[in-house]
UniProtKB/Swiss-Prot annotation:
UniProt key word Cell cycle: yes
Keywords from the UniProt entry: Cell cycle, Cell division, Cytoplasm, Septation
Protein name: Cell division protein ZapD
Organism: Yersinia pseudotuberculosis serotype O:1b (strain IP 31758)
SUPFAM superfamilies, alphabetized: YacF-like
Record GO cellular component, one term: cell division site
Gene giving rise to this polypeptide: zapD
InterPro entries: ZapD, ZapD_C, ZapD_sf
């Protein structure tokens, strides 16, 4: 069941804070994956992700929420340190990393401001909502920019991504600790349905076998959740009466 080549992992947030964090993580990964802007396709993916990230960052107190979570994780680790047999050096190392991330995040300029003030991103953002609105005749500035020497383009992009490093580093360690807080455990759904108590968790992680081709429809919040398994082929696919899968409530 744990064979990664024959299974697929799904994650589902159980609160709005986690929903925002997962979206930010996805967008930051997109920016990193398409940082080599050597063609229009990579460039548009990069700038669309940058535009989406600006929108996400403007919707809430991202810095405040992350700082609170960094502190919460430090407190949890302190409790672990008092348990006999725990690797105290590892716990101390993680706590120091959390403190370091918090200090950097606290002193960083307004998160996302560099993206928002970037002229090229601003110009491209105005055209993203228009179907086909990023043609060279619509965006001659982008067309010229893409024909600049790669060193010049890279310097521009590296500066933008460096401004996001405090956010990226804090988010990464937080999500890593949350994901590692609970192991995947074997479960069985009956007639395509499973439900349980969430116990104040932030995140559901679910690993399914690739065959049969199913996907989970998840609803829930911090106290309770329900999962319904549906066939990818809604007309001809079937859902087993008993389905084995793995689940973690983090």
């Amino acid at each position: 069941m744990s064979d990664l080549t024959s299974t697929i992992l799904f994650e589902h947030p159980l609160n709005e804070k986690m929903r925002t964090w997962l979206r930010m993580e996805f967008l930051l990964q997109q920016l990193e994956s398409h940082r080599s802007l050597d063609n229009i396709a990579n460039a548009l993916t990069f700038f669309r992700s940058a535009s989406d990230l600006i929108d996400v960052l403007e919707r809430g107190e991202v810095r405040t929420d992350l700082l609170k979570e960094l502190e919460r994780q430090q407190q949890k680790l302190q409790q672990w340190a008092d348990i006999p047999g725990v690797d105290v050096s590892l716990v101390d190392s993680l706590r120091n990393q959390l403190k370091s991330r918090a200090a950097v995040l606290m002193s960083a300029p307004r998160i996302g401001q560099s993206l928002k003030e970037d002229r090229l991103i601003s110009v491209v953002r105005q055209r993203l909502s228009i179907p086909g609105g990023c043609c060279s005749f619509d965006l001659p500035t982008l067309h010229v920019w893409l024909h600049q020497p790669s060193e010049q383009r890279d310097q521009h992009i590296n500066k933008l991504l460096a401004s996001l490093a405090p956010l990226h580093q804090s988010l990464t360690i937080i999500l890593d600790l949350i994901r590692q807080s609970c192991p995947l455990r074997s479960q069985i759904s009956l007639n395509g349905f499973f439900q349980d108590n969430a116990g104040g968790a932030d995140l559901l992680r679910l690993r399914l076998p690739l065959d049969p081709q199913l996907y989970p429809q998840i609803s829930g919040h911090k106290t309770r959740y329900a999962i319904r398994f549906l066939a990818l082929d809604s007309e001809n696919g079937t859902v087993p009466a008993r389905l084995s899968f793995e689940l973690a409530c983090c």
